[in-house]
């Protein structure tokens, strides 16, 4: 069967700290074009690789990877909220297949997800509920982090499973590219934040969640004025990364350590492993070609903003 892929940066700052209208129109046009291509493909199943930002996963249990057999979006930063349409039996079968392939994939029957999962479903499919989805969490912020090699192997395992389903499968990768927004770190946290990172942050009071979101908005506003206030975006790295993906050379990323990636492009750049997993997955379907490449550094969203599609040729 055929597969389609789309990888897209996300940002909670969309609608809160936006770039100039010209840039916003350009990005919206890119997303609209991707949405049209996906609609023409008419997927029967979505596999969504996405990270979390201490909204669903915490240090009480922090797996490198987790498949949501059931999942609910919390609606942070005004993103869509509600249950994701996960086909339970298919998700269970996927988990068993991935485990048999040698990848230790955690499962959750009540996975809580944030804008990292919700935005691509909203932007590219028109909502959370349009197509059955297998949501796959890839840890991108909480050390210790999975590396490129293991993430690639996860994508390959999921790709091999879905290639047997006789369905039109859409692989989505959500996150990146270079960026380092103000995300708390356990090693530097005070007692209150440590408690939140250990699990109490899963049910934040509305007032505290609003303060947290306002801190991110304020950081973006300062970053627009002075890009020395956060780790700088790295367009050179971002474009080199996208070229590796387009050329099917993702295995070369195995040699890039987590520490090196953080230093080059920022500590939240590890979200790009969702893109690696998606490209690894589609590679198991046979020959493919990329299309729709777009990139622009957008300080207002604290992100090197990228968009890239691929389709199988068989």
From Swiss-Prot:
The keyword tRNA processing does not apply. One of its GO terms (biological process) is 3-phenylpropionate catabolic process. Keywords: Aromatic hydrocarbons catabolism, Dioxygenase, Iron, Oxidoreductase. It comes from the Bacteria. InterPro entries: DHPP/DHXA_dioxygenase, Xdiol_dOase_suB. GO terms for molecular function: 3-carboxyethylcatechol 2,3-dioxygenase activity; ferrous iron binding. The active site is at 115 (proton donor), 179 (proton acceptor). Its EC number is 1.13.11.16. Pathway: Aromatic compound metabolism; 3-phenylpropanoate degradation. It catalyses: 3-(2,3-dihydroxyphenyl)propanoate + O2 = (2Z,4E)-2-hydroxy-6-oxonona-2,4-dienedioate + H(+); (2E)-3-(2,3-dihydroxyphenyl)prop-2-enoate + O2 = (2Z,4E,7E)-2-hydroxy-6-oxonona-2,4,7-trienedioate + H(+). It holds the Pfam family LigB. SUPFAM superfamilies: LigB-like (SSF53213). Its cofactor is Fe(2+). Homotetramer. Catalyzes the non-heme iron(II)-dependent oxidative cleavage of 2,3-dihydroxyphenylpropionic acid and 2,3-dihydroxicinnamic acid into 2-hydroxy-6-ketononadienedioate and 2-hydroxy-6-ketononatrienedioate, respectively. Belongs to the LigB/MhpB extradiol dioxygenase family. This is 2,3-dihydroxyphenylpropionate/2,3-dihydroxicinnamic acid 1,2-dioxygenase.
């Amino acid at each position: 069967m055929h597969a389609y892929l789309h990888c897209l940066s996300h940002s909670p700052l969309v609608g809160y700290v936006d770039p100039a209208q010209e840039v916003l129109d350009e990005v919206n046009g890119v997303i609209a074009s991707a949405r049209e291509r996906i609609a023409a493909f008419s997927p029967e199943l979505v596999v969504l690789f996405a990270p979390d930002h201490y909204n669903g996963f915490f240090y009480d249990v922090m797996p490198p990877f987790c498949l949501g057999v059931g999942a609910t979006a919390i609606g942070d930063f005004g993103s869509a909220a509600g249950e994701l349409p996960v086909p339970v039996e298919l998700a269970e079968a996927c988990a068993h297949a991935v485990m048999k392939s040698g990848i230790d994939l955690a499962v959750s029957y009540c996975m809580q997800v944030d804008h990292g999962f919700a935005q691509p479903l909203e932007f590219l499919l028109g909502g959370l509920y349009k197509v059955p989805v297998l949501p796959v969490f890839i840890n991108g912020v909480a050390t210790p982090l999975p590396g490129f090699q293991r993430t690639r192997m996860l994508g390959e395992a999921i790709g091999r499973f879905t290639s047997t389903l006789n369905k039109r499968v859409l692989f989505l990768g959500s996150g990146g590219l270079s960026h380092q927004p103000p995300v708390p770190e356990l090693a530097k946290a005070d007692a209150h934040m440590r408690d939140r990172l250990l699990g109490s942050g899963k049910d934040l009071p509305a007032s505290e969640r609003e303060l947290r979101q306002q801190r991110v908005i304020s950081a973006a506003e300062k970053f627009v004025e002075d890009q020395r206030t956060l780790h700088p975006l790295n367009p050179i790295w971002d474009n080199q990364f996208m070229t590796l993906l387009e050329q099917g050379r993702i295995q070369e990323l195995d040699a890039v350590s987590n520490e090196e990636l953080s230093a080059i492009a920022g500590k939240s750049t590890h979200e790009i492993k969702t893109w690696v997993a998606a490209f690894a997955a589609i590679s198991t379907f046979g020959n493919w070609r990329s299309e729709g490449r777009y990139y622009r550094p957008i300080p207002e969203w604290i992100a090197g903003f990228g968009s890239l599609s691929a389709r199988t040729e068989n």
